[in-house]
Amino acid sequence: MVQTASRSLTEENGADVLQSVQVACTDGVTRTVNVDKSLNFPTGWLVKITVNADGENVETLSGQSVSGTISADGTALGDAVLASDVEILDTTAEGLAGTVSPSRLSGVTLSASDVRYYTVDGNGAIDRLILNDATGDLWTYGVLDDVTNLISTAASSTTNTGSGSSTSNTAGSSASDLVAGAVESVMPSTSTLLYGLVDGSIGSALWESVTSSTASLASYLLKIGANSTTGVVSSVLDYMSSGANYVCYVNGEQTTYKTSVKYPVLAGGISVRKTASGSVGTMAQLLPVTVDQLGAASVRSGSTRYETADDMQVYLWYKGKYYATTLSQINAEDYSLIGWYDAHGSAAGGKIRVLVAVKKD
């Protein structure tokens, strides 16, 4: 799959004739191939690399799909046998790719849309399988730091007058307070959110409906400000259409994602799908569940079982801050546990990616 195509051309005998195309291959190796500059290979396209006497060639591939359930032992996809040395590559439209073991897909049902391409060997067994974000493992997971960072941005954007003053317009300040209050009511602080999930005052159904899309978040925000002035509504729309800095903890380290648009994330667990160059392609909210029971590779919330990701992150929320920790350091009797799982629609997704421990009263 094409990850990048560089127009920094290579000179051959004084003439610019080649461009570099970076391709993620099913064996897990990323290869760079030089091809004619007139050819076009957009990020995410499926290609095949061949080598002959004239050098390397890159050919585009048409989609070829298959569907079925991966057997428990990872040796078959529906009625089709998987070769013992099968190469499986999960991919995203933004150019990310990663190899997948058959055991990772054990028991997973793949639809035709989950499989972008496959090939068979001389025995008719599938020996290469390219997936379409079927695992969810290519996303980056973490927790969003206190959302007041975004609230303060909304407030400051509405206090300025045309001359840039933030103190000379009383109506502007009033509008600022209304917008900040509206944003804060739909985007609660992390503490409000976590304790609200624990005590049930914030329902999962409401949470999911508000964070399903940026439009849903904007709609909810505008309903809150429906009785306010036109200026407030305009300010809310301006707020939703502008970019933001998302301060997060990822694998225990604080990092900031700068985006040109707002995404429907409020607080707690989030997921980021990056481009091949490392910028943000999209961002989504993880969905929360209160954890009643911890298992070796799963958790239970009521009667529902959720598998945990192998690289699940664990955080302690204490006095307004996140602290990276491990399960062995958490005493479940003293802490309420909130699991955050991905709901992107990945066939082998839906795993708990982040676990947050909140001190009980």
For each feature predicted by the language model, list its residue ranges.
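...the same signal can extend to comparable exposed beta-sheet modules
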Residues: 1-361
